[in-house]
Amino acid sequence: LVVPWPRAISIRAALALTISHLLVQALKRMVNRERPDATALIRCPDRFSFPSGHATAALAVALSYALTWPGLAPLLVPAAVLIGWSRVALGVHYPGDVLMGQVIALATVAGVAMMW
C-alpha cells in the first residue's frame, strides 16, 4: 500500500491554512477589535484581536492531519486547542477571539475536505 503523503496531505493542510488565514485577516480589518487592555506577556504582531490567527492556524493544521491519520487526533487536536487558549492566558486575546478562530478553522478544514 502506497500512501500519497506528504504531498497530497500537505497540500490540503496548506490550503486550509491559507484560506483560514485570509478569512482571519479580512475579519480583523472589518471588526477592528482592540486587544485586551491588560499588559500582554508577549509582543503582538498587530493591534487587532478578533479572531485569533494563532488559534485558527493551529487547529486548521491539526485537523487537516487528524483527518488523514485519526490516531493522531488525540495528540494534535488538544495541543492545537491549548495553543489557542494560551493566547488568552498571555493576555493578547479575549476568549471569543479564540473561539471564533477555532470555528473558522473547523469550517475551513471541513470545506477543504469536502472539495479535495
Please report, for each region that a protein language model flagged, where it lies by residue.
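Helix-loop junctions at the membrane-solvent interface of multi-pass transporters
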Residues: 4, 30-31, 115-116
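Cytosolic, membrane-interface loops and tails of multi-pass inner-membrane proteins
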Residues: 31-44
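Interfacial segments of alpha-helical transmembrane regions
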Residues: 1-22
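Membrane-embedded catalytic cores of phosphoryl/pyrophosphoryl-handling enzymes
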Residues: 41-116
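Transmembrane alpha-helix/helix-exit interface in multi-pass inner-membrane proteins
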Residues: 17-34
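Hydrophobic alpha-helical segments, especially transmembrane helices
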Residues: 13, 29-30, 55, 88
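Amphipathic alpha-helical interface surfaces
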Residues: 10, 22-27, 57, 61
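Residues at alpha-helix boundaries and short interhelical turns
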Residues: 4-5, 35, 69, 89
